[in-house]
Amino acid sequence: MITHMVTPDSTSSAPNSPYGEDTIKLNSSVISSSSPVRSTSYLQNLQLQQQFSQLQFLQLQQQQQQQDQQLALQQQQQQQQSQSQQAQPYANPYFQTPIDQLFQFDNNPNSSFNPTRPPNIHTNQPYVSPYLHSAPLTNHSDLQPQPPPASLSDSELGLGLVKQQQDSLPPQQQAQSQPTPLLNQQHPFYNEYINDMPSTQHPYLIFNNTNAAHSTTSLPNLDAANPSSILPQSALNQSEYYKVTNGSMSNDPQPSTFLYNLHNHSADLVMNNDLEFSNASFDSIGGVSVSAAATGAGAGAGDYSHTNITSNFAQTNLHSSSQQSGVLPPPPSLPPPPTSLPSQQSQNQYLDVVPPQQLTNNALKTEANSPLITDSANFTTSQPQFENTILEQSPIFSNNTILSGIDEPSKEKSPNMLNSTLPLSKSTPHHIYQPSSSSSSHVRHNKITKKSSLSRLNTSSKKNLRANLVHSLSTPTELDDANNNNNDIVTPPKTLSPLLRKKTSFINVKKENDIDDSHDINCKNFSIDIDDMDDEDVLSDFSQPPPPIGGVSNDTMRSLAPVGGVGLGSSGNITGYRSLSNASSTSSHGSHHGLPVMNIFRHNPDSTKPSTPSPILSTASSSSTLSNKKVVKKLRGRKSKTKMNKSSIKTEQVVNEEPQVKNYKDDNDNDNDNGHGHDHDDENGGVSSDVGTGSNSTPSTTTKGKKMKLNVDLNNGGGSGTGSGSCSDENTSGNGTNTNTDSTSTSNPMVKKKHTRRRLLPRSKKGCWICRIKHLKCDEVTPICGGCAKFGLQCDYSSEKPAYVTDKILRQKKLTEVSLIRKRNQAKTKISRKKSSNDITND
């Protein structure tokens, strides 16, 4: 029963409607139109209309395509005729460029990128590039191609229409209607990159060129006389093969400026007509006639030639390119192999002015180990610059040759070198006579030495170099005989000049001691002859030759530290040389200003105090009775270390000075075995004769007060009445010292070093007690754990904690017992490698 009248326009139910509140009512017209009968008929009518329209569209499209194909064929014929008549084939501004090729698929939704496959290598069919015929796009901002202007001719207008119509075609029909380009077309944009070759119109020329593909890898092509090696040539001319068009429209053959590097199978361009001789053959290059003389032993003689290059082009182009690049032009033809050295031509370029100087007889007498001036630390050359340039250009000087003569003009222009007090060594300095980079190869077998740097050599580690310096400064090496005919080299005096005498400074001696603290003393069996020494003469005049070395055996000659560099005998000859061992490590360190080297002993390492300019050999003159005695220094050993406890030392300075003095006492032990004693006149004066003996050849860096204090401490602690004592006193004091050290070592045992645990956490909480006291991680295997089984131990798995776990003493005993068992077990297993049977029995 309907209780409410529903109007046709009502879309919602009334409040009292039996329908729900969400019910929506529709009009009768809507209901009738949405009936299933009427909806199906309506859809059928729509489908019929769409099918009819599609059929009409397809018919129209097919007709249009047929018309377009006919028009395209006509326009192709007209295009060929017009292009054959035109001088410039690319007068059409609407011809497509590679930039247009990038946009052709974006602008045409019907076309897709479908390039054709390049032909095989052995085919001679002309290749049609897919990049040469698509619709032109002149304005890239507008996605639609613009129509050609009205000023164009009918043929060009038709060509533009054909191009536009082809864009709307599918890609299959478009590929069919593409006009085939002429074989002699030229493309301006491609001319900068790719050769315009008719049969190989593709960027990857190496894969399409028949000649290039055959010639790069086939060696039989080298034989020009063999007709079987001649491969089938393609349709292109050899004269046009290597022709590169540079955008010019002229048809004249141009000289090639780009060559393809066919050796590495790439399109790399080689500039400046450089022919790649690494190529296997010349067949890939057009216009090249190769004879057997250029290719190998097989055919006639002659040089290769190119048809596109004129006779005078090679020389003119090479000279022009060499002027631009700054490199000398190579010869036009390959010269025969040179019979002389290859570096003689480069020598002649630089040594035309300076004639090569021949070696003299004096150069052959040069000793190989003669000291060099430039090997020293303080050598500075005062020669003018032009001498170095002349000497560096000469290739005949090696490291050990002698400059036979210097030009007279250079001698006159260098008075500093002639008047210099530094002696001119006849051995060649490295940085002056270093062979230049263009020197001949017969000099290069010599050792190449680095140019000496004064800042690098001015260190305390260059011991031998400074020794050579003093040798060259004090007494120059006599390399020439008495009948020396070369008078152009000034021989310096054998003694130092007064200028060097004034530069005497004992601060250098202080530097000596500063550096010597870090060096071990390795000097023994040193002998001094100081009979004829006078301290006043030595201090006043350094021109006196240093004392000679005498009384030295051949065995001890190797480790000598000489007194003054080179000792001069009575006849003036060289009687000894400086030792180059560690004993004379820095004895010439104080001679930075050309000072003569004193005989310096490093007995007092206290270098914190400044040195006092006390007389060097004053104590030596007071103890003149020690004329022919030997002062022997031994290495620091156990004996000197055990005797450090001989005296009760209270200050740190005495502790630092004591081991050096103990060495002298050890020396006196060896020297006094024959019953000879020393004078002790100076004993109460503060300096014992033993200490004086040590300081007779060195400037003492401590005052006499320190030596008195040292002597008093030695007398009080030694138990004997004298500082050095006689033979019996020294022996008794030495024995007492040994007993004291032994007693102190037994009474005060060494504190055992604490070792960290060999295994960190996690430690075993349930393992055997042996692994727990050894701080090892036990694997908790119940019969016997792995650690105990490895070393043959008895595993302890007792439920209660053993006593050796809590008690330290018992634990130490248990650990020692375990270690002994472990060592025995390891000795049994590893007896062949490490231990012998005697060691096992001793264990």
Swiss-Prot record:
Regions of compositional bias (Low complexity) in chain numbering: 580-589, 610-627, 692-703, 725-748
Induction text: Up-regulated during growth in alkaline conditions, in response to various filament-inducing conditions, and during oropharyngeal candidiasis. Induced in both white and opaque cells. Induced by SFL2 and repressed by RFG1, SFL1, and by NRG1 under non-filament-inducing conditions. Also repressed by linalool. Expression is also regulated by BRG1 and EFG1.
DNA-binding region of this protein: 768-795
Keyword Nucleus: yes
GO cellular component: nucleus
MF-aspect GO terms: DNA binding; DNA-binding transcription activator activity; DNA-binding transcription factor activity; DNA-binding transcription factor activity, RNA polymerase II-specific; zinc ion binding
Residue ranges, compositional bias (Polar residues): 102-127, 416-427, 451-462, 645-654
Segments of skewed composition (Basic residues): 630-644
Entry's localization field: Nucleus
InterPro entries, alphabetized: STE20_Ser-Thr_kinase, Zn2-C6_fun-type_DNA-bd_sf, Zn2Cys6_DnaBD
Listed PROSITE patterns: ZN2_CY6_FUNGAL_1, ZN2_CY6_FUNGAL_2
Coiled coil: none
Biased composition (Basic and acidic residues): 659-683
Region (Disordered) location: 1-20, 102-155, 164-183, 318-348, 401-470, 580-759
SMART domains referenced in this protein's UniProt entry, alphabetically: GAL4
Ranges of biased composition (kind: Pro residues): 328-340
Main function: Component of the RPD3C(L) histone deacetylase complex (HDAC) responsible for the deacetylation of lysine residues on the N-terminal part of the core histones (H2A, H2B, H3 and H4). Histone deacetylation gives a tag for epigenetic repression and plays an important role in transcriptional regulation, cell cycle progression and developmental events. UME6 controls the level and duration of gene expression in the filamentous growth program such as HGC1; and is specifically important for hyphal elongation and germ tube formation.
Subunit structure: Component of the RPD3C(L) complex.
Protein name stated in the entry: Transcriptional regulatory protein UME6
Organism this protein belongs to: Candida albicans (strain SC5314 / ATCC MYA-2876) (Yeast)
Taxonomic classification: Eukaryota, Fungi, Dikarya, Ascomycota, Saccharomycotina
Name of the encoding gene: UME6
